[in-house]
Amino acid sequence: MGSDAKNLMSDGNVQIVKTGEVIGATQLTEGELIVEAGGRAENTVVTGAGWLKVATGGIAKCTQYGNNGTLSVSDGAIATDIVQSEGGAISLSTLATVNGRHPEGEFSVDKGYACGLLLENGGNLRVLEGHRAEKIILDQEGGLLVNGTTSAVVVDEGGELLVYPGGEASNCEINQGGVFMLAGKASDTLLAGGTMNNLGGEDSDTIVENGSIYRLGTDGLQLYSSGKTQNLSVNVGGRAEVHAGTLENAVIQGGTVILLSPTSADENFVVEEDRAPVELTGSVALLDGASMIIGYGAELQQSTITVQQGGVLILDGSTVKGDSVTFIVGNINLNGGKLWLITDAATHVQLKVKRLRGEGAICLQTSAKEISPDFINVKGEVTGDIHVEITDASRQTLCNALKLQPDEDGIGATLQPA
């Protein structure tokens, strides 16, 4: 082939640059230009349906790509002095060697370390085990696949971050329309409008706010057994759903957290064998404007839930059929907040706690036709001034002049007139 001064490829065909050959000044608008080991392409401009593929051992220099043009760099291939413009896509792993610039700045991949790439329009980077990527931007249809470690990733609308088992991510930001799928480990993630699905991985210090959704233990199709989140913060506009696995420690301020029932919810999902139950442990604080809804059957005995003024805790037993419903919790502190106990048509409701203390209200919702004096009782240590309100299914008040009176033995309380 030799060295060409000017080439135009727009016919959709495939052209190969073989060992020892050099092609220069190519305008690639349709079709593929493949640079094999020992081959070299210089000053290639890739747009439209054009695709420049640099195979292992091949070299590309001064490549420009944009407007739907694609550059693929295989493991062991080299592409230097790249210029990426709007609409371009690059596909590679951390075994490639590249450097260049795009509208957001400069980027490089060398010796297993990637920094600064802009991945969009189907572009993707595969971070291999033992390798690292930092400051990656994911936009429309851009993907980052992590078996190694990554940090400071920004996922914008249409972008997707995937962290596989053994992979780790830290200090990532998921904006509106962005997606984070986690099966490895993550820390200090900010969900600022996007979605995060923990698929049996572990995350810590995740912040959920501004219309974003966090899901633990599911991708919407299957439940995953070993998922865990620690020190979760759910702020105004944020929503967290626990479908399977463990939530340990949370602060909820203006957001909503839902622990789904492990027995009746998710019945349309494929369930992993020996999947973990839905479990809440550690310290949970519900601040002003916060709500937590817990499905019946979730494991709560190792939790301490504090409900501040303006916060609402809902224990939902509406799926339980029959006359009796028992709610089992660790510790509940009512600091001016409300505890709702939701039942179907139960005539006897029991709340089992280690400790129930503070000042606040318990609101019991039922469609039962009759309310007896022993309609509700509490087993466990009870202290403070706790009033009780009973409503029907539409939350119309049936009786509100009631309070919990601690038993003389100090290990329970019963319903008494206020």
UniProtKB/Swiss-Prot annotation:
Signal sequence extent: none
Effect of gene knockout: No change in cell adhesion or biofilm formation. Increased biofilm formation.
GO annotation terms (biological process): DNA damage response
InterPro entries per record: AIDA (IPR030930), Autotransporter_pectin_lyase_C (IPR012332), Pectin_lyase_fold/virulence (IPR011050), Pertactin_central (IPR004899)
Protein name: Protein YdhQ
Gene source species: Escherichia coli (strain K12)
